[in-house]
Structure formats: C-alpha cells, structure tokens
Amino acid sequence: MSDDQVHIVVHDRGRDLSGVVRPGESWAAAARRTCASVHAEPAPRDLSGEVKEFVVDHDERLTVRAMTRGDLPDVLRWRRTDHIRRWWAAEGEPTPEGLEARYGPRIDGLSPTRMWIAEVNGRSVGFVQDYRIADYPDYALLGPDSDAIGVDYALAEEWSGRGLGPRVLWAWMTRTRHRFPDATTYFAAPDHRNAASLRMLAKAGFTAGLWFDEPQEDGTVDTVVGCSLDVARVLG
C-alpha cells in the first residue's frame, strides 16, 4: 500500500477491521466496505488522525429527529446548565417564553433554521440546528462558502464525555446529505476557547480553518474558528 493512501479502521467488539480508501471513494464508503460482513453501519470514533477510526456500536442506536414543542422543556433544562450556558450566553437567559419565541418559528418551518433532537436508544441527549449560510447574508460574508450548510449543536451535560459527539454530528450529516444533496461543505464556527467542541468537530471529519470575529446578538464579539467538512471526501 502506498504512503499516500488514507487508511481506515473499524472497531467492532474488540476486533479491528482495517482497510484503505480507494481512489474516488469517500471515507464513509470505505468504512462500510471494510465492515461489510458485520451488516451494521459504522460511525466515526476519530477522523482527525492519519488513520480514520470508525466504530460499530451494536448496543446504542443514535438518531436525529425533528424538534417539537414537546422537546422545549428539555432544551430549556440543557440551556440552563453551565456546561452549555457559557457558549450560548449571547442569546440571553433562557426562559420558556424566550425559547418559544426563538424556536417556535423554526419548529413550524417559518425560519431558514431547522431544529433537531439527538437521541440514543430513544432518549433525548442534545439538539442540533442547521441552516443554509446564504440565508443569513451577514453571516455568509464571514464564512468561506455561502452555499455551505451551517450547524450548531449542544449535548446535555449528563451525556457529555462519552464519545457521542462525533456520532451525533454523523447522524445529522447523513440526514443532511439527503436534505441538501447539492451542498459540498458543512460549516461550524465554535468559540476558539471551546476546546471540547473543536475536538468533537475534528473527530467527526471537520478541518479547522481561519479564526474570525463574529458579532453576537447582545452586541459582543466572539472570536471563533471556522471548521469545514468536505462532503464528497467524508460522506460521498
């Protein structure tokens, strides 16, 4: 095997199934081919290294579904924890009325932003929001690709630190691949101090790029790191 090949390993119940990415093949397709005998869908464990690590989990099923108003009490509870609050502070103190005003139109399909709930075996563990960056012209000027799909996310504190983050993003990405088949890039811009979020993105296949100053709703400015995912290379 040549040194310029991308190597894949799929972890499955103590076994390591190894392979390489063929020319023109995505990392996801290579992982599925490598573990074809397992008859299960691989998800990323860590795509940030030279060897792209995937895992097959036979016990935890991770999915994303559309958010409903019935999810708002959970979202309110999550948003009030220090774990999430510091990174969403610009939106103000979370209240039931505030969340209804912000998320209600998104739930109803009246906003370019859509809301999703991440679940593990049917239990809600966090939320994701996405949007076509071009629908927000001020933000589009800051990003590298105005046609990219932007994404923000938060995991409940009690579910953090379990390696779920990359798999949450993967579940969202595989769904988004069908919703926006023409999109070539997914884009996230976490605060430069949010090391956990940056690591989560890297493990899911994103590449960190330029730092830039992003104006916030409360008039402050945060320095964020633009992170992009090449859809064709990672997902196919």
What is the role of each PLM region?
Residues 1-20:
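N-terminal strand-loop-strand
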Residues 83-104:
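Conserved GNAT-fold acetyl-CoA-binding loop/helix
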Residues 79:
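Residues forming the ATP-binding cleft of Hanks-type serine/threonine protein kinase domains
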Residues 104-117, 126:
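A short helix-loop-beta-strand connector motif used in the catalytic cores of GNAT acetyltransferases and
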Residues 16-44:
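The catalytic Nudix box helix
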Residues 5, 113, 222-226:
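Short hydrophobic/aromatic beta-strand or adjacent loop that forms the aromatic wall/cage
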